[in-house]
Each structure stands twice: as structure tokens, then as C-alpha cells.
A protein has these predicted regions:
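Short active-site neighborhood of thiol/selenol oxidoreductases, capturing the structured segment around
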Residues: 79-109, 128
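Thiol-/selenol-based redox modules, centered on thioredoxin-like
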Residues: 180-229
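N-terminal targeting signals for export/organelle localization
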Residues: 2-68, 229
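Short helix-capping segments at alpha-helix termini
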Residues: 117-122, 150-152
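Short, internal strand/loop/helix patches
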Residues: 143-191
Length: 229
């Protein structure tokens, strides 16, 4: 006998509240980032309860992939979530004239791009950067930025679109912060987290994009993730 429980609000709310606290307060403990052979899942989920012949109840949790999206990249081509199915993807949110954390985050992403190319060239890795200031980050501007940091555009897309669509994707899809702010550097308050997605576009980890140690953990976790069937 099976029962499917959709939108279990109490469990989901507790999970999301804990995650948001970690993200908003920046209380990531690198020691706690060590992983076993199986990485955790994050985000919304369904629980299916199964009752066996012996009356034993079992719960099977299914996590949702990130939401659908469609944005223009640095070459004015439409990119959707389907372009990342089957790949392990590193995702960040940035803007090209960001005066604070973005240059550091982009440099860390570029460093891992090179590290993967040299040490694991056959790994199905992709990189994805969403502009949180898309009203000024045109495809041409994104292309110049990507070239400036040495991005391999065969594996790394920089996306722009309607501001609210990107804010909603960050906040509702990735559970991360992104919104205009008069008090934030560059006029946008946004997360410093880099998200690790598995081949099914499910969120499997959050990392401090300004920390070499945290990004090295991401590198290790991506390799672990590549071994999942």
C-alpha cells in the first residue's frame, strides 16, 4: 500500500528554515563540510510512504530539481535548464560591475574550471553564472567579462534576463538571496554561495564562493557526485 504526501509543510518548512539560516548568517563550518560517499540533498521534496506485507512502514524521499528557466547567454543564445541535464553543474549569482565579492567568486570558479580541465578532463562538469543585474549586463557585456576571467565558453554560460525572473529563481529555486538594495555594494545584495547540482539538476551542496578551502571542498564533492549512478 502506498501513500504519497505532497508538500509536507512542517518537514519542508523546518528544512528550509535551517538552510536559510545557514545561508543568511553565513555560518558555514568548513569542518562540517566534510562528506561521506553520499552527498546530501537540498530543496523541496515529496515523501512516499510504503507499507510492506509485514506491515513495516518505509519512507522514500524524492527531491525536486531546480525550476525551469530560459535566459540569454553571452552569445545571445537561449539557454534552459535542459542544457544542463546529465551534467554536474556549479552555479553562482553575480554581476559584472560588482565591486565586492563577485571578482573573487569568479576567480574561484575560473580556478576550478582549470583544475577540472587539468586533473579530470573527462568529468561532465559545467559552469553557470546568473547575472543579478541583468538590466545592465547585456550579452556583449557578459561576453567581455567572461573573456576577461578566462572562462571556457564551451562549458560555462553567463546568463541575463528579466531581473525579477532571476531574483525569483535565486530565492525560490536555489533558496539564495538576490535583490536590489540601496545599501549594498553596487546596488544589489546577493549571496556568495556556489551551488552544486547533480546530473538530475538537484541541489547537493552550498559553498562559500570567496573561500579557497570551501571551493576545494566543492571540487572534491563534484568528483564524488560524478561516481553516482
Amino acid at each position: 500500500m502506498k501513500r504519497r504526501l505532497n508538500n509536507i509543510k512542517t518537514i519542508k518548512a523546518a528544512s528550509l528554515t535551517l538552510l536559510c539560516c545557514l545561508i543568511f548568517l553565513g555560518c558555514t563550518d568548513d569542518k562540517a563540510s566534510s562528506r561521506s560517499n553520499s552527498l546530501p540533498y537540498f530543496g523541496e521534496f515529496d515523501i512516499e510512504l510504503t507499507t510492506g506485507a509485514d506491515g513495516t512502514a518505509q519512507a522514500d524521499t524524492s527531491y525536486y530539481p531546480i525550476p525551469k528557466f530560459s535566459f540569454l547567454n553571452q552569445d545571445s543564445l537561449w539557454i534552459t535548464q535542459k542544457d544542463y541535464e546529465g551534467y554536474i553543474t556549479l552555479v553562482d549569482f553575480f554581476f559584472t560591475d560588482c565591486p565586492s565579492i563577485c571578482p573573487v567568486m569568479s576567480a574561484q570558479m575560473a580556478r576550478l574550471q582549470t583544475k577540472f580541465s587539468l586533473e579530470h578532463p573527462d568529468l561532465p562538469i559545467r559552469f553557470l553564472s546568473f547575472s543579478v543585474k541583468p538590466e545592465t549586463d547585456t550579452p556583449d557585456k557578459l561576453k567581455r567579462y567572461a573573456t576577461g576571467i578566462g572562462a571556457d565558453l564551451s562549458r560555462w554560460n553567463f546568463l541575463t534576463g528579466k531581473p525579477q525572473d532571476i531574483y525569483d529563481l535565486a530565492q525560490d529555486g536555489f533558496l539564495l538571496t538576490a535583490f536590489p538594495s540601496d545599501t549594498a555594494a553596487g546596488g544589489i545584495f546577493h549571496t556568495d554561495k556556489v551551488t552544486l547540482l547533480d546530473r538530475s539538476l538537484r541541489m547537493r551542496g552550498y559553498y562559500d564562493g570567496t573561500s579557497t578551502k570551501s571551493m576545494d571542498q566543492l571540487f572534491t564533492d563534484a568528483i564524488t557526485l560524478s561516481k553516482e549512478s
